[in-house]
């Protein structure tokens, strides 16, 4: 039956993953290190990284999110140790994707580790995307203050790369929450006006400026009322 076949495939994937983890550990063992006097230690490390990544993929396939995140973390730590920083950041992002299924706080920690690497490498668009992801995770958990902070950071990094469209999306989130949740109307007004003035300078966006200016007017009315 189909359910039996599915269970069998999951079982096979997990068994393969366990074998790959075991293989990686052997390659990194001191005994293995001494065997590489005539070989390449670097190659063994690369092999171990590959084993951990493949194990992560297999655990992910079987929806064993905890083991998958652990395998990606081990790969990421090894990559970082050997200065493969971009690869390490990617591993941490993969670990976070698995962790967000059951442990959002730890998922966020991994995303922050990846952001730190991407900022150091000058890859600000990647850093912005991950801040945006963290903002969404906090938003889902209704932790809106933290969410807004990360939307702001995402907007800043998008600005660095002159990516106005995505920066604007994040800033609108900040302004909407500033006005609707926190009663910070002055902050919201400044953001809405900034967005409107930019839209007015860009011919194809001019029509959008009305929305932002209307929201700014509403915020002014709220200040007058309260």
Identify the residue ranges that each predicted region occupies.
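Structured C-terminal portions of repeat-based eukaryotic scaffold domains
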Residues: 164-226
């Amino acid at each position: 039956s189909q359910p039996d076949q599915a269970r069998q495939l999951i079982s096979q994937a997990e068994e393969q993953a366990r074998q790959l983890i075991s293989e990686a550990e052997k390659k990194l063992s001191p005994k293995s290190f001494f065997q590489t006097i005539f070989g390449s230690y670097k190659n063994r490390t690369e092999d171990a990284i590959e084993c951990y990544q493949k194990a992560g993929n297999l655990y992910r396939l079987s929806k064993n999110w905890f083991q998958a995140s652990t395998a990606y973390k081990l790969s990421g730590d090894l990559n970082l140790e050997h200065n493969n920083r971009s690869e390490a950041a990617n591993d941490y992002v993969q670990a976070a994707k698995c962790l967000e299924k059951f442990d959002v706080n730890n998922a966020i920690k991994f995303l922050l580790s990846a952001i730190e690497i991407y900022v150091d490498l000058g890859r600000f668009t990647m850093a912005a995307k991950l801040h945006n992801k963290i903002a969404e995770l906090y938003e889902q958990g209704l932790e809106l203050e933290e969410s807004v902070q990360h939307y702001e950071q995402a907007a800043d990094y998008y600005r660095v790369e002159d990516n106005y469209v995505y920066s604007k999306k994040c800033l609108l989130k900040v302004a909407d929450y500033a006005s609707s949740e926190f009663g910070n109307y002055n902050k919201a007004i400044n953001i809405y006006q900034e967005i409107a003035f930019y839209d007015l300078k860009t011919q194809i966006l001019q029509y959008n400026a009305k929305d932002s200016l209307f929201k700014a007017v509403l915020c002014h009315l709220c200040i007058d009322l309260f």
